Amino acid sequence: MVLEATMICIDNSEWMRNGDYSPSRLQAQTEAVNLLCGAKTQSNPENTVGILTMAGKGVRVLTTPTSDLGKILACMHGLDVGGEINLTAAIQIAQLALKHRQNKNQRQRIIVFAGSPIKYEKKALEIVGKRLKKNSVSLDIVNFGEDDDEEKPQKLEALLTAVNNNDGSHIVHVPSGANALSDVLLSTPVFTGDEGASGYVSAAAAAAAAGGDFDFGVDPNIDPELALALRVSMEEERARQEAAAKKAADEAGQKDKDGDTASASQETVARTTDKNAEPMDEDSALLDQAIAMSVGDVNMSEAADEDQDLALALQMSMSGEESSEATGAGNNLLGNQAFISSVLSSLPGVDPNDPAVKELLASLPDESKRTEEEESSSKKGEDEKK
């Protein structure tokens, strides 16, 4: 296994926004760099990898050579895109970072991802290449994008020729297409190195060729932490989607329930209104009838019947009084002995001198005497009052 310190130069220029490499040049490059860092650190525990960017406001070192893969991958997030790459300055700064490596036994290697046009002339690039060769620094170049630029491959080939010593440097031209940038690089010397593919690279290539054999295309035997992180992330996303779907279903059910409640309330109000309308109709009818009676529009037959009953009662009352007076007059006549005696004497066959008739007449009260007594008693009462 080769003990090596590597600096990877990333192209973050404006051309990385293009989508000729899925999903974009920058994303495809980032995936390839992540896989390359894993291959380097897994091939030898003492290998170190550093990252720098070539565009933007200037060349910027994201991390110096380190064996901490987590630190290397973390510095790749949130890259700024813009400007043009400064290839010669980036190579010189990468060489300086390798010169200050902690383990001097490590071989030095620079890997350049060039996805945008090269503005430098061949002569300037050859000068930089010769300097690398003098300091025993190997160079790998990944040329992608700008397929119609014929000068770009020639410039990069000239740079590689100036650096190459014992075929320790390599260049890979990756045309745009359906294949991912990382998948193409897996079988190239950039990944496999001069001594053949390591176990990590071979397993990664097998996973890329048959990614459906493992969850998320990652073999848990090679990188269990990555496989676990991907699985946890997928479970969290699934739980979030299920919660969102459940919430949407609950909201839809609540809306339907509210609609049914509103419909039932409207029906209840309508029924109550109909029920209340009937008594009001009756009250209105009674009110109309009372008004009609007050203006004389109602049939007064019942009142006429009551008047007839009242007249009949008055007539009966007066008849009773007349009968009482007649009875009183009759009683007065029967109480008069002279009248009875004259009546009996006028009857044929009746002898007024008969003792039985006389006894009967004697038993009758003398009305005249009673009248005189009443008059005398009334006079005495008047005298006493005086």
Curated annotation (Swiss-Prot):
Instruction: Note the InterPro entries from the entry.
Output: PSMD4, PSMD4_RAZUL-like, UIM_dom, VWF_A, vWFA_dom_sf
Q: Where is the UIM domain?
A: 221-240, 282-301, 305-324
Keywords on record: Phosphoprotein, Proteasome, Repeat
Record keywords: Plastid included? no
Give the encoding gene's name: RPN10
Gene Ontology terms: biological process: DNA damage response; leaf development; leaf senescence; pollen development; post-embryonic root development; proteasome assembly; proteasome-mediated ubiquitin-dependent protein catabolic process; protein catabolic process
Q: What does this protein do?
A: Plays a role in maintaining the structural integrity of the 19S regulatory particle (RP), subcomplex of the 26S proteasome. Plays a major role in both the direct and indirect recognition of ubiquitinated substrates of ubiquitin/26S proteasome-mediated proteolysis (UPP). Binds and presumably selects ubiquitin-conjugates for destruction. Prefers multiubiquitin chains rather than single ubiquitins, with a binding affinity for 'Lys-48'-linked ubiquitin chains. Acts as a potential docking subunit for both ubiquitin receptors RAD23s and DSK2s.
Residues with PTM Phosphoserine: 263
Subunit comment for this entry? Component of the 19S regulatory particle (RP/PA700) base subcomplex of the 26S proteasome. The 26S proteasome is composed of a core protease (CP), known as the 20S proteasome, capped at one or both ends by the 19S regulatory particle (RP/PA700). The RP/PA700 complex is composed of at least 17 different subunits in two subcomplexes, the base and the lid, which form the portions proximal and distal to the 20S proteolytic core, respectively. Interacts with PI4KG4. Interacts with RAD23s and DSK2s via its UIM3 and UIM1 motif, respectively.
The known PTMs are summarized as: Phosphorylated by PI4KG4 in vitro.
Q: Which family does it belong to?
A: Belongs to the proteasome subunit S5A family.
Q: Which SMART domains match?
A: UIM (SM00726), VWA (SM00327)
The protein's matches in Gene3D superfamilies, at most eight in alphabetical order, are given as: 1.10.287.3990, von Willebrand factor, type A domain
One short Pfam name that applies is VWA_2
Please give the organism. Answer: Arabidopsis thaliana
Put simply, this protein is called 26S proteasome non-ATPase regulatory subunit 4 homolog
* Region annotation (Disordered) ranges: 241-281, 344-386
Per the record, what phenotype accompanies loss of this gene's function?
A: Displays reduced seed germination, growth rate, stamen number, genetic transmission through the male gamete, hormone-induced cell division and increased oxidative stress tolerance. Is also more sensitive to abscisic acid (ABA), salt, sucrose stress, heat shock and DNA-damaging agents and shows a decreased sensitivity to cytokinin and auxin. In flowers, epidermal cells in petals were larger than those in the wild type.
Locate the compositionally biased regions of type Basic and acidic residues: 241-260, 366-386
Instruction: Please list the residue ranges that the record marks as compositionally biased, kind Polar residues.
Output: 262-271
- What GO CC annotations are associated with the protein? nucleus; plasma membrane; proteasome complex
Identify a single GO molecular function assigned to this protein. polyubiquitin modification-dependent protein binding
Tissue expression: Ubiquitous with highest expression in flowers.
